[in-house]
Design a protein with these regions (language model features):
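Beta-sandwich interaction modules
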Residues: 10, 14-16, 41-56, 64-147
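Active-site-adjacent structural segments surrounding the nucleophilic cysteine of cysteine proteases
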Residues: 126-128, 134-220, 395, 407
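Short, exposed beta-strand/loop patches in secreted or surface proteins that constitute
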Residues: 13, 17-25, 30, 249-252, ...
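Conserved active-site-adjacent core of cysteine acyl-enzyme catalytic domains
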Residues: 38, 204, 209-343
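N-terminal/edge-of-domain interface segments
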Residues: 1, 38-41
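Low-complexity basic/metal-binding stretches
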Residues: 331-332, 337-347, 353-398, 403-409, ...
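Noncatalytic regulatory segments and standalone regulatory/sensor domains
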Residues: 3-19, 24, 29, 50-53, ...
Length: 445
């Protein structure tokens, strides 16, 4: 699928157009070739050369499964200055491998890589791209499988389109920084948004699990968007980075798919703006002021109940950087969870047991018998059990938290009110209520 400056490669027909070296296609995925029932130790796949509009920034994404003792490495090169640059690696990747982003420059000095973004240093920018993925294994019975490759560029002269106005709102779980593990820092905003995007489609994953799965060991942060897309791919969700305009965002919402968007704000005392990842969950129109607005989930809010916010469309277009992460509903059968920590990965268990007398009316009380010494804040996971099927709130306004004195808000909240009863489709069905006397707890897989 090609949308101007965004390129997404997936499926047998698309992958078959590239060059396969010790690599085979199996169920629409790139896997290592086999001989006598054993996988080869190394293989490589190279895409065709793609022409793109002149661009200054490039973001590459991949979705792959990599069992134990297997690994994936994605590389790219750019056509700039009437020649192809050298290959630039995004580092070796696997769910249980200590991922490290790379800051490097090509030998010819025409492009350089900072984390998840390739920048073209030539005056005319780049006009072509080519991707390559290397697969390797130390176990001849296991192979990595690459299901999606994508490349997104920011054009030098970006002719942005607005598309048709849209009045639609989608359900998206609310997570805020203050209610989750503070040791990840402010950059945990991206894991919060990614967890919300996956849990909207019925996944049951904590933001902390996403943070561990996409943590960049080079910077000890969770701000790498390429690792975020790869973590979502491990759970079976097609996910990729993109550079989107308003028309692209409206198309995603029209297709019942919330989007992770990056907006910038300025903080007093700092010269450079600060980027924040938010969840875009809809568009609307206010007849009272005759203005369009967008519906966002702001993870920097005071509490989970105040994450939902509204921003004027004109303000959003001024703050929106164009960077986005698209995630689609999984159409593949459930796979063993590669992200969840457990004793086999060196993680201690959280032992939960019921405490106190059985009080069905008052709920169940759980006590933590053991906590990891470095992570003493219990994750707070909020599913949508009380949300009607249409995604609307049950007939009552949200409780507004007290505003902290002197704290600057990430965006101007024009208003807060319950979602309308005629909200759009796409919310997950309500979960079945627990029967009295049962206790639910998360166990490691």
């Amino acid at each position: 699928m090609e949308q101007r400056n965004n390129l997404v490669l997936q499926g047998t027909e698309t992958f078959s157009r590239g060059a396969l070296d010790n690599v085979a296609l199996e169920s629409g995925a790139l896997v290592l070739d086999s001989s006598a029932g054993r996988y080869l130790p190394y293989g490589s796949y190279t895409t065709p050369e793609f022409a793109m509009p002149a661009f200054c920034n490039l973001n590459v994404s991949w979705n792959a499964s990599a069992p134990h003792n297997t690994m994936v490495e994605v590389r790219c090169r750019v056509y700039a200055g009437n020649t192809w640059t050298g290959w630039m690696s995004f580092g070796k990747w696997a769910p249980d491998y200590p991922r490290c982003s790379i800051n490097a420059q090509s030998e010819d000095g025409m492009i350089f890589l900072l984390g998840d973004t390739v920048t073209v240093a030539t005056p005319g920018g780049g006009t072509g791209i080519q991707l390559q993925v290397n697969l390797s294994t130390n176990d001849d019975k296991s192979t990595p499988a690459v299901r999606l490759l994508s490349a997104a560029v920011r054009p030098l002269t970006w002719e942005k389109h607005e598309g048709r106005p849209l009045n639609r709102r989608l359900y998206l779980p609310e997570y805020c920084l203050s209610a989750h593990d503070p040791s990840f820092g402010r950059e945990m905003d991206l894991p919060l948004v990614m967890a919300a995007l996956m849990n909207r489609w019925g996944e049951d994953i904590l933001p902390e699990e996403v943070a561990y799965a996409m943590e960049d060991n080079a910077t000890r942060s969770t701000g790498n968007a390429a690792f975020a897309a790869a973590a979502a791919g491990c759970c079976g969700f097609p996910c990729w980075q993109a550079w989107m305009d308003l028309q692209d965002l409206r198309t995603q919402i029209h297709d019942d798919c919330p989007v992770a968007v990056r907006v910038e704000r300025r903080i007093r005392g700092q010269r450079d703006p600060v980027g924040i990842w938010m969840g875009l969950r809809g568009f609307g129109h206010d007849d009272a002021v005759m203005a369009d607005y967008v519906l966002l989930n702001d993870p920097t809010a005071d509490s989970d109940g105040s994450v939902n916010c509204t921003m004027a469309l004109s303000d959003f277009l001024r703050y929106f950087t164009g960077r986005a992460i698209a995630l689609r509903c999984s159409r593949r059968p459930a796979q063993p969870r590669p992200l969840r920590p457990g004793p086999q990965r060196g993680w201690p268990l959280l032992l939960l047991r019921a405490a106190g007398p059985a009080r069905p009316a008052a709920g169940r009380f759980l006590r933590l018998d053991r906590l990891h010494p470095a992570r003493r804040h219990r994750p707070c996971h909020h599913g949508p059990p009380d949300v009607p099927p249409d995604g609307a709130h049950p007939g009552r306004g949200p409780v507004l938290p007290a505003r902290t004195a002197g704290r600057r808000r990430a965006v101007q909240r024009l208003r807060r009110r319950p979602d309308r009863p005629d909200a759009g489709r796409g919310s997950p069905p309500a979960r079945a209520a627990q029967t009295p006397g049962s206790t639910a707890c998360r166990t490691s897989e």
